[in-house]
Amino acid sequence: MESNDAINKEVFGHPVGLFVLFFAEMWERFSYYGMRALLVLYLVEEIGSENPGLGWSAEDAGSLYGSYTMLVYITPILGGIIADKVLGYRKAITTGAILMSLGHFALAFNPMPAFYLGLGLLIIGNGFFKPNISSIVGQLYPDGSPKKDSGYTIFYQGINVGAFLGSILCGYLAENMGWHYGFGLAGVFMVIGMIQFYLIQNMFGNIGLPPKKGNLPETNDVLDSIEEVKKQPLTKVESQRLIVVGVLAFFSIFFWAAFEQAGSSLNIFASDSKFWDSLSLKQAISTFFFVNIFFRFFLNSSSLFE
């Protein structure tokens, strides 16, 4: 059996593999939020300005942003299924990282076909990367481990740090050198995350490998199990829990609808506001995007090393 240094070695009481995934996810979120902070502003910036954009209307830019975000949330479902059935988590993560790197670099070019190609690659790559790196985090801990929750809290801080740095640095570069330099920087850090994970992934041993054919259940056995589950009615406790899940899911719709305004309408509002000029602050308005990320970092930091 392969040794599993990712689990056997610990740092701050947690498997060392957690911190490998922490940095891989941090650089991926750097690239994602860095690009996301620029997207709508690039779309609405006038073609004839000093830092020319595409000259879209705010409505069209918001529509594209909404479609992009919707697909970014949908594709992880498909990416998770493909990883479970075919690729395994590690190959799915590497595949997603490659696609997203290519997507960011495609955005760094001016022709419109490259722009749409870049968005498509980012959507597909995110579907492979995002759900599967989180799944590996869960497999670093035995079932019922009290450390798993705090492990995910540490992992989530990588998301916050990456988003914080990405929105600031990509925004600064886009404002002072040009939009495509900002998109290119996002690609550079995505490549860093990809290389880091690829070179160190063997430390995870058997975790995240493609499923073996012998371990896959026969189709008839699966169908029989499904039929057996169907015949069993939900208990009272299960029904109550499903109701709670439904209520939370309903209200989460409004939360995410408001949250996603940070990358669209709030960005445009901040860009058009005269407040910045009155203070003589000619800085990348896209860096305003990091405020909610900064707040979330402290909101989730209380249980880091429990």
Give residue ranges: language-model regions.
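Hydrophobic core of transmembrane alpha-helices in multi-pass small-molecule transporters
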Residues: 26, 103, 114-129
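Intracellular juxtamembrane helix-capping segments at the cytosolic ends
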Residues: 128-142
